Every structure is written in structure tokens, then in C-alpha cells.
From Swiss-Prot:
SUPFAM superfamilies: RibA-like, YrdC/RibB. One of its GO terms (molecular function) is magnesium ion binding. Its EC number is 4.1.99.12, 3.5.4.25. GO terms for biological process: riboflavin biosynthetic process. This is Riboflavin biosynthesis protein RibBA. Pathway: Cofactor biosynthesis; riboflavin biosynthesis; 2-hydroxy-3-oxobutyl phosphate from D-ribulose 5-phosphate: step 1/1; Cofactor biosynthesis; riboflavin biosynthesis; 5-amino-6-(D-ribitylamino)uracil from GTP: step 1/4. The gene is ribBA. InterPro entries: DHBP_synth_RibB-like_a/b_dom (IPR017945), DHBP_synthase_RibB (IPR000422), GTP_cyclohydro_II (IPR032677), RibA (IPR000926), RibA-like_sf (IPR036144), Riboflavin_synth_RibBA (IPR016299). Residues 206-410 are annotated as: GTP cyclohydrolase II. GO terms for cellular component: cytosol. Zn(2+) binds at residues 261, 272, 274. In the N-terminal section; belongs to the DHBP synthase family. In the C-terminal section; belongs to the GTP cyclohydrolase II family.
Length: 410
């Protein structure tokens, strides 16, 4: 598709600020879905009527985590097993003059506008209802590359309340509208069409999730590195980057994005391969003479140390690593790579050879505009303790592991 058919973020923000709809897709290079997005506080009955006729999808409203707490919008389910981790809350209807069943165009428009009205409170809504709020991650598209976060970011950047209306666009036959369909809608109704990829780049230029606080030379058993410590504005953690050589050139850089594992990295636990992967990555960077290891404080694939140990207890009772997380009410992997991407951006990394076995990590980092020219395997020979763990990562989480772990029937 020609890029000239994709509108600028600035032009879309102008339209949103004027109370218009825009179409948002993931990336112009992909045959993916598109959503109508607008600022919730600019919604009209005419807009909702148009969306129900032309989009045919589910009317949702993206809110910040703080706004969800203010309005007491609790998660729809305690155990979210949705494929894309969409953070639905309980559905709502507005309690207001003229609102009856909640399903009419007027009723839904009122509910959406009131969700975007800062004077609304928890008692302004009945539950369940006909509008589905979604909780956006703090940090927006720089933390999660999704339409939910895009809706909040776009509303905020347009000078509106940071609450966004979004609705998937379906084809007339009920299937998902694809790129050609979305372009037809764009031209027919004179709407702006933008990509989340461009929004991420726009936010990368103007918003920072992390700030480099200090750096120092660190001699290690694997070699000498420059250690950069970063302060995070979203999770209040201190993250690190071990840097070898000049990584700010156009030549692809050997990179490892490693999440904290205190038990494996520090105490050499045999339950996982984390410590061995960390050591191997540092050795490979030292041998290369140039590279980066980003160390993110995302213990236990993002569930924290205490929950990780609870998961270990469940594994001792027969659960695998995925089942244990789900039994505790978590997804198999809660990590996000927005912070890691910003650290790499700060270091000047443009192209990378990424050391990972995890396809989600490749997709996650590419979503932030980083170019991965090669995936470098980082396989560790299993031991008697972690054999089943590695099989589960391969068979259930899609990790690209070719080691002799057995049949995987566990």
C-alpha cells in the first residue's frame, strides 16, 4: 500500500479534537483489522448511529487505570484468558435523564459521554449494561501496542479527556474488514486513517517511559561492560543495560532483553534456564565485542517473586508453568517490552540481532519500531529438574527450542 494513503498522526489529532472519527489500524504492511476511534467526550448520537451502521462491531470505551478505579470499573473476569489480553471491565449503562434500556443510540451515546466526563462518578452508572469499558495500560502504546491504548493516547493528545471510544469495523458480510475495505470507507466518508505503528513512533519522539540515571564501568566474570541504570516513570522500577562497545551505529547490534529471575540469575535455581541464558548472553556479547543486554525488573514473567514462588508450589503439585500462572489468575506471560524498547532507543540501537527463543519477544519489540534483522537462538541444555518446564515453553508458549527435551507430552 502506498504510504501517501496513510494520514499523519497530527492530522488525525486535529480531527479527533473537532469531534470526528478516525480509522486506526496496526501497521500499513499488514492485512489487519481497523477500529473507528473518537474522543468519548465528543461523542454524539449521530456518531453512534453511524458506527452501528458502518462498523457493526462492539462499542467499547478505553479508560485509564486511574479512571477505572475512580468509577469502580472492576475486571469483567478474575481470570482473563482472552487471546489478546483485552482488559474488559464489567459493562455499564448511564444513569441519567432520558436513558431507558441502555441500548438505544441515545442511551449508548450518553453512557459513552459520561464515561468521558470527569464529573461522573461510580454511582453515575448501572452494572451490567450495554457499553464495555476497557482498561488501558499506563504508558499507552509505549507499554502495549493495542487499539485500547491507542484510543486513550489519541484522545489525550487531541486535548480531550483521556477516554476513547473504539469499535471494530466489520465487512457487510460480517467478516473483519481488511485493508482494501478500510481504504474504501476512508475515501467514502472522508476520514483520516492512521496506524498504531506511526502513533508509537510519534509517542517515542515526545514521551519517555524511562530516564538514564547513572552509568559506570562494571568488570564481570564475562568481561567488562558499561552499566547504565534507568529510572522508570510507569512501574517505579530501576532497569539496567549492560553495554559493550559502540552500539549506536547502523551495523546490527547483538541484543538480549532479559527479565529478572532472582532465583535463577542470582541463586542458580535448576527450575529454569534463566541464569544460564543470562550468562550465555553476556559471554556472546563479550565474544562479539559489541552488544547490549537489557535487564528488566519483571520477575516471574511479570507476576513478581511471591507469585512466582506460589506458582512453583503449584508446579510441585502437578501443574505446568502455564497452568500454574493461570491457576493464580495470570496470563502465561505478563511481560511488556515498551520499557526495554525505550532503553534500546536511548542507547541508539537501530537494528539488532536479538538473542531469544521467544517469538512473542520478537513481535513485541518490532511493535515499537525496532528492526530485528536476525533471531539468535539462546538454547540451554535441559537438566532433570527443568526438562518439563522447557517442554512447556516449547509446546504451549511457542518458544523455538530444538533441544532434546523429549516428546513434550506433559
Amino acid at each position: 500500500m502506498e504510504n501517501k494513503r496513510i494520514d499523519t498522526i497530527e492530522s488525525a489529532l486535529e480531527d479527533i479534537g473537532q469531534g470526528k472519527l478516525v480509522i486506526v489500524i496496526d501497521d500499513e504492511e499488514r492485512e489487519n483489522e481497523g477500529d473507528f476511534i473518537a474522543a468519548a467526550d465528543k461523542v454524539t448520537t449521530e456518531m453512534i448511529n453511524f458506527i452501528t451502521k458502518e462498523a457493526r462491531g462492539l462499542l467499547c470505551v478505553a479508560v485509564t487505570m486511574d479512571r477505572a478505579k475512580e468509577l469502580q470499573l472492576e475486571p469483567m473476569v478474575q481470570r482473563n484468558t482472552s487471546q489478546h489480553e483485552t482488559n474488559f471491565t464489567v459493562s455499564v449503562d448511564a444513569i441519567a435523564e432520558g436513558v431507558t434500556t441502555g441500548i438505544s443510540v441515545y442511551d449508548r451515546a450518553m453512557t459513552i459521554k459520561m464515561l468521558g466526563d470527569e464529573t461522573s462518578h461510580a454511582d453515575s452508572f448501572s452494572r451490567p449494561g450495554h457499553i464495555f469499558p476497557l482498561r488501558a495500560m499506563d504508558g499507552g502504546v509505549l507499554r502495549r501496542v493495542g487499539h485500547t491504548e491507542a484510543a486513550v493516547d489519541l484522545a489525550r493528545l487531541a486535548g480531550c479527556s483521556p477516554v476513547g471510544l473504539l469499535c471494530e469495523i466489520l465487512h457487510e458480510d460480517g467478516s473483519m474488514a481488511r485493508l482494501a475495505d478500510l481504504m474504501t470507507i476512508k475515501e467514502k466518508f472522508g476520514l483520516k486513517l492512521i496506524t498504531i505503528k506511526d502513533l508509537v513512533a510519534f509517542q517515542m519522539r515526545r514521551s519517555k517511559l524511562v530516564q538514564r540515571a547513572v552509568e559506570s564501568n562494571i568488570p564481570t566474570a564475562y568481561g567488562e561492560f558499561r552499566l547504565m541504570a534507568y529510572e522508570s516513570f510507569t512501574d517505579q522500577q530501576n532497569h539496567m543495560a549492560f553495554v559493550k562497545g559502540d552500539v549506536s551505529t547502523d551495523e546490527p547490534v547483538l541484543v538480549r532483553v532479559h527479565s529478572q529471575c532472582a532465583t535463577g540469575d542470582t541463586f542458580a535455581s535448576l527450575r529454569c534456564d534463566c541464569g544460564n541464558q543470562l550468562a550465555s548472553a553476556l559471554r556472546m556479547i563479550e565474544k562479539e565485542g559489541r552488544g547490549v543486554l537489557v535487564y528488566l525488573m519483571q520477575e516471574g514473567r511479570g507476576i513478581g517473586l511471591i507469585n512466582k514462588l506460589k506458582a512453583y508450589n503449584l508446579q510441585d503439585d502437578g501443574f505446568d508453568t502455564v497452568e500454574a500462572n493461570e491457576e493464580l489468575g495470570f496470563k502465561a506471560d505478563l511481560r511488556d517490552y515498551g520499557i526495554g524498547a525505550q532503553i534500546l532507543q536511548d542507547l541508539g540501537v537501530r537494528k539488532m540481532r536479538l538473542m531469544t527463543n521467544n517469538p512473542k519477544k520478537v513481535v513485541g519489540l518490532e511493535g515499537y519500531g525496532l528492526e530485528i534483522v536476525e533471531r539468535v537462538p539462546l538454547e540451554i541444555e535441559p537438566n532433570a529438574v527443568n526438562k518439563t518446564y522447557l517442554e512447556t515453553k516449547r509446546d504451549k508458549m511457542g518458544h523455538m527450542i530444538s533441544c532434546s527435551c523429549g516428546s513434550g507430552n506433559h
